[in-house]
Amino acid sequence: MEMSLLSIVLLGIVEGVTEFLPVSSTGHLILAGEVMKVPQGTETFDIVIQLGAILAVVVLYRERFAAVLAGLGRRDPAAIRFTRNVLVGFLPSAVIGAVAYGAIKAMLNTPIIVAVALILGGIAILVIERLVRSPTCDSVEGMSLRTSFGVGLVQCLSMIPGVSRSGATIMGALTLGVERRTAAEYSFFLAIPTMLGATTLALWKARHELGDAQATAIAIGFVVSFIVAMLVIRWFLGVVTRHGFAPFAWYRIIAGTAALIWLLAR
């Protein structure tokens, strides 16, 4: 993996902007890599820099996480429910990812698949936004085991590049009666164990291949994605509260269509 500094920074920005938006960070990294002609073999880079964006969640919600940890020490029911719901939501992707992720990636990790998934995902968001009414849950602590597990199952769809992990989990949560902002925040929290697991696995598999240049590229991309994600998360919650998810659906459809035309015409 040999990338220019400009490519590393741009990919870090793409990751930081798209990780928590329902637009597929992995899909955008694949398409951006195609446009910038990034060399093959950057999969570990793409996965590990996502952890930079995840760290932004930990920092922004540090007081809430500290309260949960303190509550667990006191056996506080709300803290226990919060932790339980995040872990239950993580379980399906941990199991299915360990078994099937490699095969799915080998078959579907192409720019064409990303473009089609962006379009179909955008249409799905518009449909769900129209159908969902009257949420019954307005907190992560208030989610049932069934809801948490259901969102976790839907998250497995995001193993298909272009689907979007945040998009799948947020739409799954909305469909199961979770309020918009809570659905977005649950998606943020669910990303922590999910991406920690994916990053650990990626680093373990690449442990004999990472040299100084690769490690430096990953470190730069990590820092850039962290800084950008810090700025994007609060903006995203404000947009969702005021306008819902339709703006992101239309973006997906337009971006996916443009990418598909470009890929087929070149």
UniProtKB/Swiss-Prot annotation:
Coiled coil: none
Alphabetic keyword roster: Antibiotic resistance, Cell inner membrane, Cell membrane, Cell shape, Cell wall biogenesis/degradation, Hydrolase, Membrane, Peptidoglycan synthesis, Transmembrane, Transmembrane helix
EC number, UniProt record: 3.6.1.27
GO CC aspect terms: plasma membrane
Location relative to the cell: Cell inner membrane
Enzyme class: hydrolase
Extra remark beyond the main annotation: Bacitracin is thought to be involved in the inhibition of peptidoglycan synthesis by sequestering undecaprenyl diphosphate, thereby reducing the pool of lipid carrier available.
Protein family per UniProt: Belongs to the UppP family.
Role of this protein: Catalyzes the dephosphorylation of undecaprenyl diphosphate (UPP). Confers resistance to bacitracin.
Annotated HAMAP family: Undec_diphosphatase (MF_01006)
Name by which UniProt lists this protein: Undecaprenyl-diphosphatase
Organism listed in the record: Rhizorhabdus wittichii (strain DSM 6014 / CCUG 31198 / JCM 15750 / NBRC 105917 / EY 4224 / RW1) (Sphingomonas wittichii)
Name of the gene: uppP
